[in-house]
Every structure is written in structure tokens, then in C-alpha cells.
């Protein structure tokens, strides 16, 4: 380890011990050196003894800084790996940090765009509008038309910090599987997933492309508005987009004061999510309250505004079908169907015992129906199914983990806005309509429509392809006949050689008998003839 890594590691150890997180170390023989090593830091005391473990962990990550805050936020979505009390505390982590110098931000943007800001923008505000761990946002106006925009710029010092901390995380992850039940936590997978998320968020060209696609998907929609991206000014570390004005969706008091129809707003959140997943196969996977606003206009017919498209997810057609049918089967309590769908989709191994799997699902999920249907959480249904399936060697599906995380956000948000929200009643017609649209005449017609351009392009080639196939067939047929004849001749040769070998063996045996009976002349004759037959047979066998 480098001196810098050692210094950083000491800081992490000091923070963790000052929050009493050494109690997370399992009391097993393997961790004895660690527990003894704890006494080597005897001067660092637990300064937060009155707080619960989950809260102490959250506060420690908050103190360690932005990289660890985002790591904690990601861990809060992995409720299949951690106790709910800890996951709930981690979900409270706020990705808010002090902004860096606006003059530095200006210089950094100018370097990326290749000229002074005044060439493209007026009224650039060096005071950040908002600041987070990865980037911060400044306001300005486009010089060409006076439109208000925001400029998002990556922190210039963030990459070395990310690399150093992720490297330390990997070192820790290499050690965790040695602990009892450590493999179940899949530490390397968790760190790898986090690293990928960070790398994606560091590339604002990726976020720009995501925002452009999401805006196109909801163009002229009455449910969701996505601000316009000005792609000409976007670079890997700078993004320029339309400035929006709205009420943060978490500000319930302001929404009610505005006269917002909370029931419609909550239901639209669910519809927006399922539209993204099942219609578009492209969903915003970071829909926490900080990224969602509500337009000031038409509060009786509320419109969501979505920002920050750095993390998105997608499902292929098969995943969508299995997911929709899983939900429908679950709410119909058809656990056999749920088990079969998991096997058919390849989410669990093909040799899984369906009866055992069905029983395990029933045992875990049946108690859920003790609640009224309106109170059942889709996200926790998925979580229970994934946890059960993992016992049957279900491979982690990253796209489903993202989906489950987003679904939990949407559910929590919907019930915060309108506690009486019946998620199943809102989603069921959507799911059933989508499943029905995938079968029957409409589905066939749609498939033909989608393939029409392909077949129109290939149609002129069909006569040549048929002619080539017929010629190839004739050539293959001729070769097959020749091979068949050669095999026949070879089999005949083999039969002859085997016949001669048999005669040779018989003659040698007879010669041996004559030799025993003292008839030397007959013995020599028979044995010579037998040897000759054997040699000829062996020779022919070798040639064939």
C-alpha cells in the first residue's frame, strides 16, 4: 500500500471505531487477529453509545465523505443482503456536500468547451445552485436565444478520490468471503456494481443521451416532463440543459398548499414507472425525491418533472414478460406458476426442483396476504421472491436489482403523497393489458410490422438465395453418395480382413494342437498357413 492509502485507511478505521462499528466484526476464530488489533487503537473510543447500529453506520459513512455516502445509498437498495433496520437508515443518507469554488468551475467548463463562457452564455452565476458528491450545478442563459439553462460540471478532484476509495473497498471485499456467511453478501459483486454506477455518473455524455431518450419517450406526455438537453454544449464532464421550476415532490406541504390533486399525482407516479418499464424498456433508475419535481402549472392535473438521468435500466422482451406474469401469478396466489416462470426465464438453474421451489415461495409469500391488498408492496414482493430464489442458486440479475430499487422509491413516494394508494389496483390493468398485447393477432401484426423493413430489404435476394441453396443441396447430395460408396467399400475390406484374421487364428490354434500330439509336420503346416493368413488380414486391416 502507498503512504496515501495507509493514511486514508487509518482515517477510515478511526471513523469506524469512533462510531463503535467494530461490533460488526463477527466473533469467530478467523477474525481473532482483527479483534486483538482493535486494542492497538485503544485511544479511539465509541463516542455514540446511545445510538442504534444502523444510525451509527449512516453517520460514519456521512463523515467519510461523498464516495462512501453514495456507497451507503447503493447498499440501502440491497435489502436482500442487509437487515431492514440498517437498510432503512442507509436510505436516509443525503448526497449533499459543500460546493467547490465557482471560479474553478468556470475555468473547468471553459477548458471543456474550448473558449470563454461569454462566447455561448450570459449571466453565468458562479454560486452553485446545487452541489452533490459527483457534480454541481450553475445557472446561466443561452446567448443565442436568452433561454435559462443549468450547467452541470463534474468535480475536478473527484476521480482520484473515487479510485483510491474503490481500491480500498476491493481490498476489504477480498477478505469478507472468508467470514461465516460472507459469500452470501457477494462483496466483490457489490463493489463492482458500485464502481460501475460511479463510472457511469462521471460521464455526462452518457447522462445527456439518457435524458434525450427519456424526453423523446415522453414527448407531449401529460404525466412526465423531461427538460431539454442542449447537446452542442455537452462534454464528458459538462452538461447543459433547460432550467426547470417546480415543487420538490418531497415537499408535501407546498404541494397541498398549491392545491395539487394528490391522488392523481400518486397514481401517475406508478403509471410513469410501468410505462417506462413495459412500453419503453428504458427506465429512470434513480428516481429518489431529490430528482423529481412537480410543475407549478395545473395542480388539478399534476405533471412530474424528472432530472438526473445518470442511472437508467432496461429490460429485454423476455424479462418484461416474465416480470409481468410473475406479478400477476403472485397476486393470484399461483405459486406454482411463479416457480415455473423463474425456471423458464433462466433466472434459476433448469434442474431446480419446481415442487420444492413452489413450497419455498408459498412459505415466504403467503403471510404477505395477511395484509389488505392495497398495503402490499410490489418492491417487497420482488425482494421476497429474489431472496427465496437465491437459496435455489438464482444468479443476480443487475437489471432486476435496479428495477426493484426504483420500484421501492416509487412505492414509498406514492404512499407518502397519498397513503390510500392501491398500487395493485393501479398497476394490474396495465400489466394485464401488456401481457395480452404480447399474444394473439395484434402481437403477430405488430411483429410483422417491425420485421417489414428487414424483409423488404432481403426480398430481392431471395431468388439468388434459393438458387444457391439448391446448387449447394445438389453438391452435398453428390458428396453424400460418394461418401456412402466409400464407406461401403471400406466395410467390405474390413469384413475380409476380419475373416482372414479369424482363419489365421484358427489355423494357428490347430497347429498348436498338432504340435502337442507330436505331429510336427502337420503342426508346422497349419501354423505357417495361419501366420500367413494373420499377416494378410492385418495388412488389409491397416490399409483400410
UniProtKB/Swiss-Prot annotation:
Primary localization:
membrane
Q: Does the keyword Lyase apply?
A: no
Q: Name one GO molecular function term.
A: ATP binding
Active-site residues are: 286
Q: Where are the transmembrane segments?
A: 499-519, 522-542
Q: Which InterPro entries match?
A: ABC1_dom (IPR004147), Kinase-like_dom_sf (IPR011009), UbiB (IPR010232), UbiB_bact (IPR045308), UbiB_kinase (IPR050154)
The pathway is: Cofactor biosynthesis; ubiquinone biosynthesis [regulation]
Q: Where in the cell is it found?
A: Cell inner membrane
Consequence of gene disruption: Cells lacking this gene fail to produce coenzyme Q8, and accumulate octaprenylphenol (OPP).
Q: Look up the domain of life of the source.
A: Bacteria
Under the heading NCBIfam families, the entry gives: PRK04750.1, UbiB
Protein name in the entry? Probable protein kinase UbiB
Amino acid at each position: 500500500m502507498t503512504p496515501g492509502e495507509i493514511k486514508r485507511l487509518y482515517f477510515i478505521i478511526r471513523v469506524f471505531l469512533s462510531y463503535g462499528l467494530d461490533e460488526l466484526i463477527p466473533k469467530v476464530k478467523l477474525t481473532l487477529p482483527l479483534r486483538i488489533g482493535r486494542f492497538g487503537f485503544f485511544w479511539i473510543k465509541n463516542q455514540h453509545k446511545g445510538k442504534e447500529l444502523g444510525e451509527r453506520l449512516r453517520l460514519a459513512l456521512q463523515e467519510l465523505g461523498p464516495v462512501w455516502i453514495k456507497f451507503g445509498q447503493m447498499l440501502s437498495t440491497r435489502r436482500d443482503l442487509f437487515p431492514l433496520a440498517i437498510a432503512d437508515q442507509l436510505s436516509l443518507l443525503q448526497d449533499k456536500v459543500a460546493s467547490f469554488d465557482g471560479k474553478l468551475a468556470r475555468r473547468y467548463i471553459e477548458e471543456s468547451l474550448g473558449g470563454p463562457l461569454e462566447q455561448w452564455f450570459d449571466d453565468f452565476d458562479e454560486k452553485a445552485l446545487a452541489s452533490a458528491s459527483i457534480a454541481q450545478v450553475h445557472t446561466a442563459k443561452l446567448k443565442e436565444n436568452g433561454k435559462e439553462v443549468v450547467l452541470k460540471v463534474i468535480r475536478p478532484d473527484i476521480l482520484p478520490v473515487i479510485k483510491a476509495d474503490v481500491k480500498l473497498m476491493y481490498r476489504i471485499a477480498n477478505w469478507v468471503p472468508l467470514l461465516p456467511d460472507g459469500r452470501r453478501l457477494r462483496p466483490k459483486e457489490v463493489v463492482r456494481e458500485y464502481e460501475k454506477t460511479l463510472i457511469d455518473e462521471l460521464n455526462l455524455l452518457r447522462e445527456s443521451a439518457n435524458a434525450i431518450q427519456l424526453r423523446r419517450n415522453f414527448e407531449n406526455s401529460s404525466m412526465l416532463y423531461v427538460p431539454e438537453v442542449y447537446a452542442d454544449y455537452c462534454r464528458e464532464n459538462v452538461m447543459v440543459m433547460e432550467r426547470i421550476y417546480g415543487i420538490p415532490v418531497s415537499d408535501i406541504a407546498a404541494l397541498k398548499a398549491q392545491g395539487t390533486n394528490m391522488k392523481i399525482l400518486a397514481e401517475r407516479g406508478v403509471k410513469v414507472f410501468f410505462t417506462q418499464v413495459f412500453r419503453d424498456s428504458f427506465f429512470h433508475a434513480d428516481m429518489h425525491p431529490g430528482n423529481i419535481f412537480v410543475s407549478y402549472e395545473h395542480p388539478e392535473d399534476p405533471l412530474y418533472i424528472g432530472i438526473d438521468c445518470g442511472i437508467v435500466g432496461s429490460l429485454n422482451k423476455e424479462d418484461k414478460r416474465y416480470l409481468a406474469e410473475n406479478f400477476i401469478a403472485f397476486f393470484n396466489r399461483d405459486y406454482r406458476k411463479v416457480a415455473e416462470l423463474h425456471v423458464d426465464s433462466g433466472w434459476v438453474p433448469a434442474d431446480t426442483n419446481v415442487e420444492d421451489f413452489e413450497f419455498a415461495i408459498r412459505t415466504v409469500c403467503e403471510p404477505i396476504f395477511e395484509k389488505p391488498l392495497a398495503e402490499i408492496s410490489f418492491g417487497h414482493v420482488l425482494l421476497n421472491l429474489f431472496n427465496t430464489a437465491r437459496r435455489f442458486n438464482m444468479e443476480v440479475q443487475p437489471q432486476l436489482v435496479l428495477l426493484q430499487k426504483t420500484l421501492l422509491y416509487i412505492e414509498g413516494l406514492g404512499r407518502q403523497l397519498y397513503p390510500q394508494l392501491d398500487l395493485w389496483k393501479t398497476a394490474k390493468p396495465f400489466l394485464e393489458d401488456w401481457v395480452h398485447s404480447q399474444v394473439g393477432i395484434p402481437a403477430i401484426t405488430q411483429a410483422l410490422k417491425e420485421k417489414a423493413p428487414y424483409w423488404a430489404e432481403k426480398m430481392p435476394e431471395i431468388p439468388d438465395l434459393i438458387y444457391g441453396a439448391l446448387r449447394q443441396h445438389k453438391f452435398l447430395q453428390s458428396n453424400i453418395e460418394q461418401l456412402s460408396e466409400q464407406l461401403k467399400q471400406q466395410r467390405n475390406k474390413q469384413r475380409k480382413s476380419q475373416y482372414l484374421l479369424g482363419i489365421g487364428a484358427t489355423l494357428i490354434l490347430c497347429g498348436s494342437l498338432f504340435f502337442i500330439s507330436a505331429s510336427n509336420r502337420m503342426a508346422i503346416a497349419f501354423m505357417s498357413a495361419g501366420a500367413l493368413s494373420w499377416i494378410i488380414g492385418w495388412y488389409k486391416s491397416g490399409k483400410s
